[in-house]
């Protein structure tokens, strides 16, 4: 069956997922596609494994930015697609192949239908980690092309195709990685009194961490601690000398993030004393909350409702993390959910976005960009 150009691009990208700052093949694909366009009014830069493209407007007064994240996840794909990932153990399980395709579609429209204002497209690496938005924003490559307004999107499996969802103000949570390493004293399983068991210490720690949210965060201010991975020990008859906990922290306010981390540190100090061990806490990457500019978001929602065939709804804030929040901290703009009607959710090995969304998104976003970019 013949598919449209942009559906094929999405499938091409889906085959080659790459993790953060290793998206060399993806970067080359983007550059090769850009090379097929008329470049009379186009400038292109690379930044690490990302790509920054500027389309010069006819009579620019501002720069409008569109950000698309391009990285995949370390997940083994189970979609059954004929165009499934050819990179073992990696998958586009968060829809970044769709985000990038929509960006290339918008770029194509922008080249053929120039508007007054300049447009900048940020094909950003490493959203899933260690975080590409902040260093890209601070880079020399972007300095002279820094947008005055910026927008981004994220696919939403739970919404139907043709639906977008967003809200003014807080949309996504503050997030932080969490790594805790415990080191005690190993020994023979027959002589537990001579050792300091880090499996037991880790078990106590996981249990105690559950009280951080329930007894330290205002119930009206949501927060979540998730421990997603525990490692420790070597074989069944040796008391473990080391253990490691890996997880995430998510809060809707910066104040709650500080409070949660303070309580984690106090609990870990107690574990050190109780089990006579050493502990190291590493918060890894932290993503700033996604906070939509109220006026721009309201204006966008009204435009979509009145002038496109898309259905726009007001959603509630989510505990999702997104490094686009760093861009919105410095640049007025917004992010929205784009419905893709998938039975399976984000970060699932069977995620299958409905490809019908690609042309719809390119069309309505092109309408919005033209409207916004030709207004004086």
Curated annotation (Swiss-Prot):
Pfam families (alphabetical): M20_dimer, Peptidase_M20
List of catalytic residues: 69, 128
Enzyme class, broadest EC rank: hydrolase
Species, as recorded: Bacillus cereus (strain G9842)
The protein's annotated pathway: Amino-acid biosynthesis; L-lysine biosynthesis via DAP pathway; LL-2,6-diaminopimelate from (S)-tetrahydrodipicolinate (acetylase route): step 3/3
Top-level taxon in the UniProt lineage: Bacteria
Alphabetical keyword list: Amino-acid biosynthesis, Diaminopimelate biosynthesis, Hydrolase, Lysine biosynthesis
Function: Catalyzes the conversion of N-acetyl-diaminopimelate to diaminopimelate and acetate.
One record GO biological process: diaminopimelate biosynthetic process
One GO molecular-function entry: N-acetyldiaminopimelate deacetylase activity
Reactions that this protein is recorded to catalyse: N-acetyl-(2S,6S)-2,6-diaminopimelate + H2O = (2S,6S)-2,6-diaminopimelate + acetate
The protein's name: N-acetyldiaminopimelate deacetylase
């Amino acid at each position: 069956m013949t598919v449209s150009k942009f559906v094929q691009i999405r499938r091409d990208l889906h085959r080659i997922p790459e993790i953060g700052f290793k998206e060399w093949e993806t970067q080359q694909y983007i550059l090769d596609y850009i090379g097929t366009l008329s470049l009379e009014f186009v400038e292109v830069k690379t930044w690490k494994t990302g790509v920054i493209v500027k389309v010069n407007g006819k009579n620019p007064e501002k720069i409008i930015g569109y950000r698309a994240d391009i990285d995949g996840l370390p997940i083994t794909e189970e979609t059954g697609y004929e165009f499934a990932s050819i990179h073992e153990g990696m998958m586009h399980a968060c829809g970044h192949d769709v985000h990038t395709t929509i960006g290339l579609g918008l770029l194509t429209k922008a080249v053929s239908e120039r508007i007054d204002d300049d447009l900048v497209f940020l094909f950003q690496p490493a959203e899933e980690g260690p975080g590409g938005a902040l260093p890209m924003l601070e880079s020399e490559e972007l300095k002279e092309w820094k947008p005055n307004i910026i927008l981004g999107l994220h696919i939403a499996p739970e919404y139907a195709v043709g639906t977008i969802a967003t809200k003014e103000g807080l949309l996504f949570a503050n997030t932080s990685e969490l790594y805790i390493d415990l080191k005690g004293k190993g020994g023979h399983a027959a002589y537990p009194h001579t050792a300091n068991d880090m499996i037991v210490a880790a078990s106590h720690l996981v249990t105690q961490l559950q009280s951080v949210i329930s007894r330290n965060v205002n119930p009206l201010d949501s927060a979540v601690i998730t421990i997603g991975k525990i490692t420790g020990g070597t074989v069944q008859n040796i008391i473990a000398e080391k253990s490691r906990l890996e997880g995430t922290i998510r809060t809707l306010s910066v104040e709650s993030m500080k409070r949660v981390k303070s309580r984690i540190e106090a609990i870990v100090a107690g574990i050190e004393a109780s089990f006579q061990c050493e502990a190291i806490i590493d918060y890894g990457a932290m993503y700033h909350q996604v906070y939509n500019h109220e006026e721009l978001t309201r204006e966008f929602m009204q435009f979509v409702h009145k002038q496109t065939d898309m259905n726009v709804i007001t959603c509630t804030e989510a505990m999702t993390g997104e490094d686009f929040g760093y861009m919105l901290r410095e640049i007025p703009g917004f992010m929205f959910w784009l419905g893709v009607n998938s039975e399976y959710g984000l970060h699932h090995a069977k995620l299958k976005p409905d490809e019908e969304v690609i042309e719809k998104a390119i069309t309505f976003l092109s309408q919005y960009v033209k409207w916004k970019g030709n207004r004086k």
